[in-house]
Amino acid sequence: MDILCGIEWDQFSDDKRAGYDYWIGSVHYLHGANTGKYYEIDFRKQDLAACIADDFGGDGLAAAEAYFRSVAEVAALGPDILGHIDLIKKLNRDGDFFDENAPRYRAAAMGALEAAHAAGCLLEVNTGGVFRGYRDDFYPSGWLLEAWAKMGGKVIITADAHSVDGLTYGYEEAARQVKAAGFASVQVLTGAGFETQEI
């Protein structure tokens, strides 16, 4: 078994990205220009609600657009893996904050996806939101995954496990969805680097 040392580096992390076997780039916070606050967008609904109300004029789609702009900025840094590209949807299962099918939402998400493609990022298919009961679908949403396949992008399946019992949760279903989206293979991280595995 290969044991590697990596870091999930957030846009607002103080940690350096160098010195690891790999790094995952991700966004977990939005910075409010009005209040100066940093809001964690994937932890508590009240935090996301306050972010939208106090710093985005009550416009949830504006918050989503800001999130995807931040993802594009992280993608431009060239992480080995771009993590949970649409994490902003985590607390939005019932559509309380924004419409995930709205043209503005989809355009913003596509902007982040195009930035990931331009930077040559490997896109994470992440099962963690389903495992922890927040979502019924993985990150990214199916339509984004299909768009990524059409771009010729590559994916890696991860569980984003915060506990041992979630280490390989949903891998078989994720592989089925990846294949249905148009991919013939996934990337697997080994001691020798990323390797292609057919599905």
Summary of predicted features, one role per range:
Residues G95-I199:
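Charged catalytic cores and adjacent phosphate/nucleic-acid-binding surfaces used
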Residues M1-A118:
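Extended substrate/RNA-proximal surfaces in nucleic-acid metabolism proteins
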